[in-house]
């Protein structure tokens, strides 16, 4: 009896040691939005001004859109205060939202951007940037706006795509109009300002570097054209394009009230 029981126990132990799941692969670790980015292949642009289509990338990083909406963290509030927001601005910080999302850079790499918009438009705006990511529309840089200085220089060379910035609306000569810009409410976005410049009624631009983009028949990365997905996607959420203005044109500018 003892020998038989011992033999049976040995068989059970052998079976337990040899049995295994169908796969021994360790589970894929969860990746945070700040994981290392994937680098996509580069090449000539398409006729729509989009970056080249990539081969599937399965290494580190994300090849599909990822974005999130949050209240403005204290660290970002400190970064904004006395630069792009201050007491007396027409919208309170608690009425703004921080968007974090990945976007396609001009060299085909996937980057992580930050943008502050009004809470009421946050979900719609994030949806637009998801469409643009899927269509491979590239951005030079997406980040929080820089400080506005009255009569100071406007830097378009970095071509930063940005939204909220508490400042007045500007006349063609860059002097304040006395009313708030829609950027002050988080209800306006400037996209690739160098590639999509503000053009005065006399055809001049604010920076010599933008003159290379005055010919809007060109189809260069990051440029916005009539009927393009960028224009249609913003129109679908009720935002208007400055390229539709009569006289002056603000090709970079999208806003809820068309100002």
Predicted regions and their residues:
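Bacterial N-terminal signal peptides that target proteins for export
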Residues: 1-7
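Bacterial N-terminal signal peptides
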Residues: 8-16
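N-terminal low-complexity, Pro/Thr-rich disordered segments
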Residues: 17-78
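Compositionally biased intrinsically disordered regions enriched in Thr/Gly
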Residues: 54-104, 109-114, 181
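Catalytic cores and adjacent binding grooves of peptidoglycan-active enzymes
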Residues: 58, 174-259
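Active-site acidic/histidine clusters and adjacent loop/turn architecture
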Residues: 91-157
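Structured segments of extracytoplasmic/periplasmic soluble domains
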Residues: 104, 127-138, 167, 194-197, ...
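Mid-length scaffold segments of soluble, non-membrane domains
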Residues: 136-140, 155-193
């Amino acid at each position: 009896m003892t020998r038989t029981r011992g033999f049976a126990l040995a068989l059970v132990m052998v079976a337990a040691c040899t049995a295994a799941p169908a796969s021994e692969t360790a589970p894929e670790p969860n990746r945070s939005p700040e994981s290392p980015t994937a680098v996509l292949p580069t090449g000539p642009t398409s006729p729509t001004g989009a970056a080249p289509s990539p081969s599937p990338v399965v290494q580190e990083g994300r090849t599909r859109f990822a974005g999130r909406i949050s209240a403005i963290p204290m660290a970002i509030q400190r970064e904004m205060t006395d630069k792009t927001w201050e007491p007396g601005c027409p919208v309170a910080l608690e009425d703004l939202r921080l968007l974090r999302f990945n976007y396609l850079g001009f060299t085909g790499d996937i980057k992580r951007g930050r943008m502050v918009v009004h809470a009421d438009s946050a979900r719609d705006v994030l949806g637009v940037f998801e469409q643009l990511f899927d269509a491979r529309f590239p951005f030079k840089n997406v980040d929080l706006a820089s400080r506005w200085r009255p009569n100071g220089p406007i830097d378009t060379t970095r071509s930063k795509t940005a939204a909220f910035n508490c400042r007045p609306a500007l006349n063609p000569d860059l002097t304040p109009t006395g009313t708030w810009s829609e950027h002050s409410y988080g209800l306006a976005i400037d996209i690739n300002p160098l590639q999509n410049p503000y053009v005065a009624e006399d055809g001049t631009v604010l920076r010599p570097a933008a003159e290379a983009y005055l010919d809007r028949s060109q189809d260069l990365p990051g440029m916005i054209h009539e009927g393009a997905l960028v224009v249609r996607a913003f129109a679908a959420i009720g935002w208007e394009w400055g390229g539709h203005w009569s006289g002056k044109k603000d090709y970079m500018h999208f806003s809820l009230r068309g100002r």
